[in-house]
């Protein structure tokens, strides 16, 4: 049985991953562990790790990194706490691979810890662009540390390959978020009108 770790730092990124995590947890050949950090552990964001638990997952550990984006020094402090905590956690717990999505700075620290512990990183949504933001260089840095790349479009797959990654490690799997939206159970017009009244009245979105 392979031991897979998934680290989540925000509700938004977890929401994209939730359906995939249920699929992985149902696979008898994979032992899935989940660690929540970042926004999930911050009361200012509603302690959103509880959402993960309410979805039926067991969280192996909560790692509070004293999240703050007040200024760059606070961000660097949070990153250093995260790097130290995950460095210790990954020393104590041996995993065959670690699953990471995106480009937040706490995920960057997790990736560095995993890379130095020689734990293969499976990175989702690499190759994308967010010009003028930290996300840009963080995402590409994680790409260079990852061993398996799951891109959301062919354009992003090609960009990862252009960065020097072996083509046989880069796959276009599509967008999990877009796929999730196609599976939403949308209300009918009649159901909406039973809640909000006539939809013929003027409205704005």
What spans do the regions from the language model cover?
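PLP-dependent amino-acid enzyme catalytic core
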Residues: 1, 58-61, 73-92, 170-172, ...
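A nucleotide-sugar donor-handling region in carbohydrate enzymes
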Residues: 8, 40-43, 145-205
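A structural signal for isolated positions on well-ordered beta-strands in alpha/beta enzyme cores
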Residues: 3-5, 31-35, 122, 148, ...
């Amino acid at each position: 049985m392979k031991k897979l770790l998934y680290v989540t730092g925000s509700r938004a990124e977890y929401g994209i991953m939730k359906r995939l995590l249920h699929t992985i947890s149902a696979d008898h050949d994979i032992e899935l562990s989940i660690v929540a950090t970042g926004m999930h552990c911050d009361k200012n964001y509603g302690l959103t790790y509880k959402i993960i638990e309410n979805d039926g997952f067991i969280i192996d550990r909560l790692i509070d990194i004293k999240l703050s984006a007040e200024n760059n020094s606070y961000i660097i402090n949070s990153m250093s706490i995260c790097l130290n905590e995950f460095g210790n956690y990954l020393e104590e717990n041996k995993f065959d691979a670690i699953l990471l999505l995106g480009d937040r700075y706490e995920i960057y620290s997790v990736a560095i810890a995993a890379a130095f512990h020689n734990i293969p990183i499976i990175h989702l949504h690499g190759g994308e662009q967010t010009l003028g933001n930290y996300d840009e260089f963080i995402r590409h840095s994680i790409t260079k540390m990852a061993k398996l790349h799951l891109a959301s479009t062919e354009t992003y797959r090609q960009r990862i390959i252009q960065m020097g990654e072996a083509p046989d490690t880069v796959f276009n799997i599509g967008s999990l978020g877009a796929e999730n939206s196609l599976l939403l159970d949308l209300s009918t017009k009649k159901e909406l009108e039973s809640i909000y009244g006539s939809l013929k009245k003027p409205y704005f979105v």
